[in-house]
Amino acid sequence: MADAWGWEYDPDSDFVIGGIDNLAFVAKVEERADELVRAASALYLGGTKYDGISPLMQEESIDASGLFVYQVIPRHQRVCIRRVIFFAA
């Protein structure tokens, strides 16, 4: 279990963002993930002691470029990015 809040690609980056070659878009996803981590750490102050139900998966748009699906898991102090979709021009 982690000592501090963070985010990760779940199950791994190859599965979640593999094939997306637009590095600027990926950087925007990761920047937004950092913001979600800060928000989750403030919302779930108990972190590892949280005993409620984990929030459902949510969707976050990145400009008109694409979106990603994520889930906050308070007990593991993680924001898990499950899927990234890039709308190729």
Residue ranges and their predicted role:
Residues 1-67, 72-89:
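Basic, Lys/Arg-enriched alpha-helical interface segments
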